[in-house]
């Protein structure tokens, strides 16, 4: 289970939590412009926009979980188990395997207008990366500074939803997630008035009672509502430090602690990492479950005209600044 969100001050920010019971050895990976992507059904992409994001690298190929390109378009793939369906290769379409979808989009789209044009021609297939690495059941959020969409490949076709919340979690499908927000239309960051009855002098006995009823569990529908409420009512300054800090606070509203979500006997889902991309400046920030310090990798401090992948391992050891 994972959560993704967008945020905008004077710059545009995008990120996600990756919630799972184990890591695949994730790294921050920069794919420079002249790295050659070998797509299974649509040939090679030898020159493209530079990309930075979190990935598992297999056979010198970046399997991105979330990423942004040098133009400010960002996207992430999140679990969509039970609903994701990837058809066979379809004639007349640009057939892209699900593991290729992120580089296919980010490699050639400079804005959401170009993303929409690309999506109109695409068929996302279930072609596996390798025999022992089948296609993951995913759906995607794609965004720039102006808008966001959710992309879901299901048995009844490819769905492309406008995403006015700039938020995505897992199941149910996105249109149902949006409908369920109707349950929370009465919530507010302000203190509520007594509308129960004029006959009862009911009072607010605590701050924060305007959001009474906001779900606090870890289910995907509840996380969707909680992070949407947090993000859409969020207030911060627009400096880099304030914006990045606020973004981590937004996703912090849905992070998972060890022991609270058991997935098997003695195994628990945790927030392995949280990312925050400044898509305007090309800076990838992250924290991990075991290291709360914010770490940054700036794509523009690398040679983006190169042809080889650039790797940075996640810094996992807790870093504590001692004041005395």
Task: Spell out what each predicted region is.
Residues 1-93, 126, 311-317, 322-324:
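A contiguous strand-loop segment
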Residues 1-13, 118, 127-130, 135-136, ...:
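C-terminus-biased signal that marks the final domain/tail of proteins
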Residues 20-22, 81-83, 156-159, 166, ...:
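Short, surface-exposed beta-strand-loop junctions and turns on beta-sheet-rich folds
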Residues 28, 68, 149-153, 159, ...:
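Broad, structure-driven detector of short, well-ordered beta-strand segments within folded domains
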Residues 92-128, 240-248:
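Proteins synthesized as precursors that undergo proteolytic processing into mature forms
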Residues 135-159:
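Long, compositionally biased
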Residues 18, 79, 144-146, 155, ...:
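Short, flexible loop/turn elements at secondary-structure junctions
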């Amino acid at each position: 289970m994972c959560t993704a969100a967008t945020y905008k001050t004077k710059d545009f920010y995008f990120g996600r939590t990756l919630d799972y019971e184990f890591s695949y050895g994730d790294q921050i990976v920069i794919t420079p412009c002249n790295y050659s992507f070998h797509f299974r059904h649509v040939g090679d992409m030898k020159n493209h926009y530079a990309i930075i994001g979190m990935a598992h690298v297999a056979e010198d190929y970046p399997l991105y979980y979330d990423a942004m390109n040098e133009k400010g378009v960002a996207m992430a793939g999140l679990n969509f188990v039970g609903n994701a369906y990837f058809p066979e290769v379809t004639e007349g379409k640009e057939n892209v395997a699900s593991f290729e979808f992120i580089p296919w989009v980010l490699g050639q789209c400079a804005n959401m207008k170009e993303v929409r044009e690309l999506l109109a021609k695409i068929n996302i297939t279930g072609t596996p990366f390798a025999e022992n690495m089948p296609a993951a059941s995913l759906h995607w959020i794609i965004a720039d500074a102006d808008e966001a969409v959710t992309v879901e490949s299901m048995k009844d076709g490819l769905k492309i939803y406008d995403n006015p919340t700039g938020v995505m979690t897992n199941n149910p499908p996105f249109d149902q997630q949006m409908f369920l927000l109707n349950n929370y239309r009465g919530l507010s960051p302000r203190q509520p008035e007594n509308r129960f009855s004029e006959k009862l002098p009911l009072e607010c006995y605590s701050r924060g009672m305007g959001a009474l009823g906001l779900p606090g569990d870890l289910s995907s529908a509840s996380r969707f509502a909680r992070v949407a409420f947090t993000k859409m009512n969020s207030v911060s300054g627009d400096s880099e430090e304030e914006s990045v800090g606020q973004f981590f606070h937004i996703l912090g509203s849905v992070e998972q602690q060890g022991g609270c979500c058991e997935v098997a006997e003695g195994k628990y889902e945790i927030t392995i990492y949280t990312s925050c991309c400044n898509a305007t400046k090309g800076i990838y920030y992250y924290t991990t479950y075991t290291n709360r310090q914010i770490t940054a990798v700036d794509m523009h401090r690398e040679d983006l005209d190169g042809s080889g992948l650039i790797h940075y391992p996640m810094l996992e050891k807790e870093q504590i600044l001692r004041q005395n």
